[in-house]
């Protein structure tokens, strides 16, 4: 069994509904930071979550998002097993028999959550995107920066080789993006 802290706050899914589906770019980046840190830790000990979605992210009393529900988690060194798939949050390799899941799979799922936080639109399931990549035709919200849009495109790439290999790589680009936005803001103050 797994012992976890008791969390009674709303899930990100409930929070999104309450806030009409869109969260500001800056707020989303701040909210996702502890989730990225949690993923970096579990990946460092050889575990892949495999079920990141807004209903598996819950707020604690301090307003920080916590990653929950490790029921689908896998040891990344194991052979391919039956995968748990949850719509647009599931990486394409989780559907394919020949592919292995890894930290890059959680990167895809996290970016799908982030995309939804910013746009209020769910990413189409990867199996549909493999047929015809509809993500390219979706327009990002006008208040989302080009840099964030590029980070999301890379994180949601259908090809593992074009995606961030780890959440640490993703985190570096997010932090760099946040710092560049702060510099631009300072210039105009």
State each model region's role.
Residues 1-11:
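Conserved short submotifs of the Hanks-type protein kinase catalytic core
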Residues 12-23:
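AlphaC helix of the protein kinase catalytic domain
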Residues 31-32:
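Activation segment signature within eukaryotic-like protein kinase domains
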Residues 36-47:
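Protein kinase catalytic-loop region centered on the HRD/HxD motif
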Residues 80-93:
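Conserved activation segment of eukaryotic-like protein kinases, specifically the C-terminal portion
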Residues 93-104:
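Conserved end of the kinase activation segment
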Residues 143-158:
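Conserved C-terminal C-lobe helix
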């Amino acid at each position: 069994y797994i012992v976890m802290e008791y969390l009674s706050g709303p899930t990100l899914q409930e929070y999104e509904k309450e806030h009409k589906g869109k969260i500001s770019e800056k707020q989303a980046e701040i909210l996702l930071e502890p989730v990225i840190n949690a993923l970096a830790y579990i990946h460092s000990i050889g575990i892949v979550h495999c079920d990141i979605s807004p209903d598996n992210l819950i707020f604690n009393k301090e307003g920080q998002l916590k990653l929950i529900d490790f029921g689908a988690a896998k040891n990344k060194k194991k052979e391919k097993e039956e995968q748990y798939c949850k719509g647009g949050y599931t990486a394409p390799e989780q559907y394919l028999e020949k592919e292995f899941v890894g930290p890059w799979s959680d990167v895809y799922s996290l970016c799908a959550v982030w995309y939804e936080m910013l746009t209020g639109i769910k990413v189409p399931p990867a199996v549909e995107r493999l047929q015809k990549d509809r993500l390219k035709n979706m327009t990002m919200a006008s208040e989302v920066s080009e840099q964030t849009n590029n980070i999301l495109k890379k994180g949601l790439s259908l090809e593992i080789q074009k995606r961030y290999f780890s959440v640490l790589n993703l985190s570096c680009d997010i932090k760099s993006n946040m710092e560049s936005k702060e510099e631009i803001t300072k210039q105009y103050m």
